[in-house]
């Protein structure tokens, strides 16, 4: 990687107009309130997410309001490393479409568009 590439890639592509209204900021506040933490920056949130992986993903599940017909018993299969591909959210049963299109129940707008030649 050249110095020019390093410099170009370190510049943000986008900065939100209202950083306190971003989902990342709201998620950080959610985690702080739920866990009694005092994460202030994105870097602190990231560091916590990679050191307490199970709590991070459990909080992602809760924050996003993931709907499931059967809840998970374990977030992450214990005793396995990422290179051995552990099982995630064991016991959970969910409908992907329900979660992706959730909140559109009362919307009269199309959820998907399709174009063909």
Where are these regions (language model features)?
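N-terminal amphipathic, basic-rich helices that act as targeting or association modules
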Residues: 3-86
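Short, solvent-exposed loop/edge-beta patches enriched in aromatic
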Residues: 53, 94, 104-106
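AMP-dependent adenylate-forming
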Residues: 33-38, 74, 100-117
